[in-house]
């Protein structure tokens, strides 16, 4: 009799879990299309900002912090984008694994990484292991807004622009999950600052060939009031747009991972 009651209890528990997973899968499937579209729609703006920054920092003799790293300052900032909720398969564990790998590489290189965490699951993981965390943010990791991107970017900007003797950092890294499609999401490590110049391949022009189109010729810029002032103005927009894009593609990845995980049960 006792064994029958135990079996019935297990059956009821299994049925309850199945209902929970089914509900989670339905919620995730209703969110994924919007999350994917929002992430894709934000990309052109971020790409335009990045192209503008690339054009600015490509100028020689630039000494602005956006492009020049303080080699004497070993402190670097690492932002890990995790999730608030579970039931998302290996989503958060993959981010934590890559973050730990990055922290180890930075330590081996003589750096002093400072950890910033977005998402309750990640902050709980590191707090449980008594890891020092410079700052944490929680709430709406599957639907991040511009406000949280601005808050995070302001904190990281303050850390980056602060002098080394006052605890500033010389580099900014972000660990996030890029949404490829519903099945594939890849963990990425992006160094946001200093900006790395992406150089295009060039070749010596042939006199017999036609001149390149105007779109292929690098434009000449005149900066008013100065290049440094322009960089001061564009730097906050660059950081916020990059972080916002990472938050959006991470949210789409989290939702897709949650839907896929629930489908397995």
PLM feature spans:
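Conserved loop-to-helix interface motifs that mediate assembly, gating, or partner/ligand docking
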Residues: 2-261
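Conserved small/polar residues in nucleotide/adenosyl-binding loops
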Residues: 265
């Amino acid at each position: 009799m006792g064994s029958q009651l135990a079996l019935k209890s297990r059956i009821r528990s299994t049925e309850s879990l199945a209902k929970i997973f089914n509900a989670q899968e339905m919620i995730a499937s209703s969110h994924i299309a919007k999350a994917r579209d929002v992430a894709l729609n934000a990309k052109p703006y971020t790409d335009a900002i990045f192209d503008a920054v690339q054009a600015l920092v490509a100028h020689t003799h630039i000494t602005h912090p956006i492009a020049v790293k303080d080699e004497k300052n070993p402190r670097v900032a690492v932002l890990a984008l995790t999730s608030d909720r579970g039931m998302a398969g290996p989503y958060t564990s993959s981010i934590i694994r890559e973050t730990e790998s990055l922290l180890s590489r930075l330590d081996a290189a003589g750096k002093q990484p400072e950890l910033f965490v977005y998402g309750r699951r990640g902050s709980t993981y590191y707090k449980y292991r008594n890891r020092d965390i410079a700052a944490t943010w929680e709430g709406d990791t599957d639907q991040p807004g511009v406000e949280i991107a601005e808050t995070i970017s302001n904190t990281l900007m303050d850390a980056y622009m602060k002098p080394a003797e006052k605890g500033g950092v010389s580099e900014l890294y972000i660990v996030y999950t890029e949404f490829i499609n519903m099945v594939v999401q890849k963990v990425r490590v992006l160094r946001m600052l200093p900006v790395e110049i992406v150089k295009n391949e060039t070749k010596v022009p042939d006199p017999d060939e036609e001149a390149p189109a105007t779109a292929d010729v690098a434009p000449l810029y005149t900066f008013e009031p100065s290049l440094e002032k322009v960089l001061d103005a564009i730097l906050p927009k660059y950081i916020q747009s990059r972080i916002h894009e990472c938050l959006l593609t991470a949210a789409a990845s989290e939702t897709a991972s949650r839907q896929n995980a629930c489908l397995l049960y």
